[in-house]
């Protein structure tokens, strides 16, 4: 297996221009494909997840052109639901942001499509979304294990009253919201359980509005969507920088700055993960907000005890930043880490212990007490881009760290380690 050893980093300083947001990129691609008119997307993320979405759109007959660096995409909208000519199988890797929205969108009209992916994708639950789509008339068959991909979709979604469980993943609600306006009837979506990752729903609603569709949001408990609508191209759309990707550089500055400025997101960003900066500030770092940047300057870091349900992806970065904070850090209400690219609660606890931390792994929380001095360790990444990026922060100590399978960052940030090196000074 490939590995990368990072030598101790004495100081970080500089500016990072963030790649486009994964969440925004894949939503925007699908809406542009469903819309009337031509859409030009700029600052599109070039990553595995986005490639899976683009490959699926190609197979579904959507025509688009990509710039050489794959960050500018011109899409000719289909002007309505996507249809496959004949039976079709789409392979979506481990891209939840492609699997969930497509599983819903391809239930409009009459299709015969199989959605499948990597072995890990077949372990990531989708039952709550399927249950909701079936309530709206969709015909869906599980081809292997009940409640998990692969799925066979045979159209039939017409709208009506649907309930969806919001407690595992907000992507199920996102998928329903994006699909419902194109259904023939009105759809009323009721949320069961506590809705996780609420800011990601705001991204969805924001993008739908950009493409000309507004819905009635009743305190995130119920959403009323008029049927028979269509999406309209906004013309050109700039994809925000990825706020989850910003977290590693901001945390690095909090630990070993200098000052690091990330551009492409700012105080008005629609991504909830910008709130990560508030957590660093609470721990003792200095944060400065601009319209299109956030900067972080080092501070003496203290432990925190916080509910992280609103920023589950960026919260992982706090787990490794906790190695540099005084005291015991507790991150709460993060059960949905367990259904991500890997079981992130288990993975994080296991690897933090390797570097010497004392860790308590709960059902939906993690408690981390840093050691006096970090141990050298080989970090397993579980084919999870965020594990690789989080544990790069260990090098901000006087101990090197080896990251196994470093190329797994290609899911969202192919040149992450080059960018980290660019702002780092060796110890």
From Swiss-Prot:
Organism of provenance: Escherichia coli (strain K12)
Consequence recorded when altering residue 313 to A: The enolpyruvyl transfer reaction is halted after formation of the tetrahedral adduct of the substrates
Keywords annotated in UniProt: Amino-acid biosynthesis, Aromatic amino acid biosynthesis, Cytoplasm, Transferase
One Pfam family named in its UniProt record: EPSP_synthase
Catalytically driven reaction(s): 3-phosphoshikimate + phosphoenolpyruvate = 5-O-(1-carboxyvinyl)-3-phosphoshikimate + phosphate
Cited function: Catalyzes the transfer of the enolpyruvyl moiety of phosphoenolpyruvate (PEP) to the 5-hydroxyl of shikimate-3-phosphate (S3P) to produce enolpyruvyl shikimate-3-phosphate and inorganic phosphate.
Site (Modified by bromopyruvate): 408, 411
Protein's name according to its UniProt entry: 3-phosphoshikimate 1-carboxyvinyltransferase
Positions annotated to bind phosphoenolpyruvate: 22, 96, 124, 171, 344, 386, 411
Gene: aroA
């Amino acid at each position: 297996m490939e590995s990368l050893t990072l030598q101790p980093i004495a100081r970080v300083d500089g500016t990072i221009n963030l790649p486009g947001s994964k969440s925004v990129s894949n939503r925007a691609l699908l809406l542009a494909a469903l819309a009337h008119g031509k859409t030009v997307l700029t600052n599109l993320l070039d990553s595995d997840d986005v490639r899976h979405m683009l490959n699926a759109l190609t197979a579904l007959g959507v025509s688009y052109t990509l710039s050489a660096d794959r960050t500018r995409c011109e899409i000719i909208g289909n002007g309505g639901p996507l249809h496959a000519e004949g039976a079709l199988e789409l392979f979506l890797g481990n891209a939840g942001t492609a699997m969930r929205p497509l599983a819903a969108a391809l239930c409009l009209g009459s299709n015969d499509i199989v959605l499948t992916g990597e072995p890990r994708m077949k372990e990531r639950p989708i039952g709550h979304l399927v249950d909701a789509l079936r309530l709206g008339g969709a015909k869906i068959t599980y081809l292997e294990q009940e409640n998990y991909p692969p799925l066979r979709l045979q159209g039939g979604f017409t709208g009506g009253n649907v309930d969806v469980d919001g407690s595992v993943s907000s992507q199920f609600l996102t998928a329903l919201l994006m699909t419902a306006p194109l259904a023939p009837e009105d759809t009323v979506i009721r949320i069961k359980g506590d809705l996780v990752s609420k800011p990601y729903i705001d991204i969805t609603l924001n993008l739908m509005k950009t493409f000309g569709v507004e819905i009635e949001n009743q305190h995130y408990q119920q959403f009323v969507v008029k049927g028979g609508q269509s999406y309209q191209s906004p013309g050109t759309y700039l994809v925000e920088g990825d706020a989850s990707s910003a977290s590693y550089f901001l945390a690095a500055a909090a630990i070993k700055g200098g000052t690091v400025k990330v551009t492409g997101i700012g105080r008005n960003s629609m991504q909830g993960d910008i709130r990560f900066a508030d957590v660093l500030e609470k721990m003792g770092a200095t944060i400065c907000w601009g319209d299109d940047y956030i900067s972080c300057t080092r501070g003496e870091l203290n432990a925190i005890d916080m509910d992280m349900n609103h920023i589950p992806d960026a919260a992982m970065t706090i787990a490794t930043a906790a190695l540099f904070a005084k005291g015991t850090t507790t991150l709460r209400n993060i059960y949905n880490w367990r259904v991500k690219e890997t079981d992130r609660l288990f993975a994080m606890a296991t690897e933090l212990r390797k570097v010497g931390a004392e860790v308590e792994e709960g059902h939906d929380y993690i408690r981390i007490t840093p050691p006096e001095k970090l141990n050298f360790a080989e970090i397993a990444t579980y084919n999870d881009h965020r594990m690789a990026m989080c544990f790069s922060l260990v090098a901000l100590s006087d101990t090197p760290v080896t990251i196994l399978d470093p190329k797994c960052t290609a899911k969202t940030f192919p040149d992450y380690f080059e960018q980290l090196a660019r702002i780092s000074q060796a110890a």
